[in-house]
Amino acid sequence: MATTGEGQRAMRRARVGVTAAFAAHAMLSGLLGPWIPHIKDQAGLDASGLGIALTGFAVGLLTGTRVADPAIRRWGGRWVVRGGIPVMGVGFALLPAAGGLASLTLLFFGIGLLAGLIDVAMNIEAVAVERRFERRVMSAIHGTWSVALFVGAALASAGIAAGLSIRIHLPISAALVVVVSAAFLRWLPSAGEATEAPVERPDEPRGRPSPTRVLLLLCLVALGSFLVEGIAVEWSAVFLRESVGADPGAAGLGVVAFSAGMAASRFLGDRLVARFGQPVVDRVGASSAFVALAAMLIVHRLVPSVAALGIVGLGLGPVVPLAFRTAGRTFRTGHASALPLVATAGYTGSIVGPLLVGFIADLATLRIAFLVPLVATAVSSLAAGATRDP
């Protein structure tokens, strides 16, 4: 481990570089949400047209995670991030100029592809920093992502409240994110060693799951956790309003509680793992989320339901960062191909989960539909218990 002054400076710079990548990615993503109704109006779309355009983003996101492996092999995670974030910023700046369904869908696809590609690459970089300096930073860096997402959304909301035009605010905001982050992205470490061929360790202790089995379990963990997160963000306000009877203003508190809990636990996640071990943190976190969701479905009151969503966020917050960490270290070299698989499983959950809840709610009730995240947390808990510290 680097202990000299020079080594400590290198570690700090590498961590700042990776953190800047996560922050830029999240702020650009956060800028999008509040402006979507305006983008819809600018393009002259109805609700179904907007749904088609946003499907382009989802398809692009999954495509990006799948093409990440060859891209990182060819250019390295550092250059994928440094080149991808400015191009992603240009994509956001062009959104107000999209003149119809076809152009908007294509643009959303491109932005989604870059978002998925950069997501995998910057997580590879975070794994490289952990391995090189023997410091656990993955969970805290994901905590920064959560905070930056909120900042980006708040910045967009402030622009809307001030009556600024989307043609001015979105391009300028995206440009600021790109320019400011560029000053720190140059500190991204070279993670070329993370692109070597994967080598399974034949001398693992007996009883330890094989890397392939661990990878499958991590995909289940990511699928379940992302699925719950997607449902919490997109459906919790509707659940509190229709199933609990909250007024429209209070219904949004569920998303706030969930997001705050997730960010807080991510900043604590690395310390908790250092003290208790990753399997314990994963298992206790997912189990706590399961109990909280079960209580929310039983108790039909606002305050306990909001508190339950906060506990769900607290429990699941570190789970995905830790899954990415293990995926990056399942193979001796931290080979890139492990992370795209886990990321693809996760994003699939975030897309399928909300759709599944809507479908079941139409057939039965929203309360019954919320059995979906309950089952997902149970699956995540069981899968997390079978993993080991990398």
What are these regions (language model features)?
Residues 44, 76, 97-102, 245, ...:
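Helix-breaking motifs and short loop linkers at transmembrane-helix boundaries and internal kinks
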Residues 103, 141-192:
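Helix-loop-helix hairpin linking two adjacent transmembrane segments in secondary transporters
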Residues 78-81, 85, 282:
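Primarily marks hydrophobic transmembrane alpha-helices of the MFS/SLC 12-helix fold
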Residues 7-37, 41, 109, 212-228, ...:
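Pair of pore-lining "gating" transmembrane helices in MFS-fold secondary transporters
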Residues 33-48, 234-250:
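Short amphipathic helix-loop junctions that connect adjacent transmembrane helices
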Residues 62-77, 160, 265-278, 361-362:
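Helix-to-loop junctions at the C-terminal end of transmembrane segments
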Residues 39-40, 71-72, 158-163, 240-241, ...:
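Interfacial helix-cap and linker-helix signal at transmembrane-aqueous boundaries
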Residues 117-132, 318-331:
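Intracellular juxtamembrane helix-capping segments at the cytosolic ends
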